[in-house]
Amino acid sequence: MQVYGCCELVRELYAQIGSGDQAYVPQAISCAVRALNDVAADESLPKDVREKAAFAAANLLISDFEDK
């Protein structure tokens, strides 16, 4: 997926990180898994949203990519 396929909020933060206005997180996979886990655990959100986040987090965890 490329940034142009993402929502406006993601594109805005991408531009801010690229320009140095927002912090870059070197261990981005771990950051993404933590964020997805927070969404999946939030019982105030609709179940389908939580399930999508859990599915994405599980796939990242099982992938062979590791943050160094």
From Swiss-Prot:
Superkingdom: Bacteria
Pfam family, one: UPF0253
Similarity comment text for this entry: Belongs to the UPF0253 family.
Name recorded for this polypeptide: UPF0253 protein VIBHAR_03255
Species per Swiss-Prot/TrEMBL record: Vibrio campbellii (strain ATCC BAA-1116)
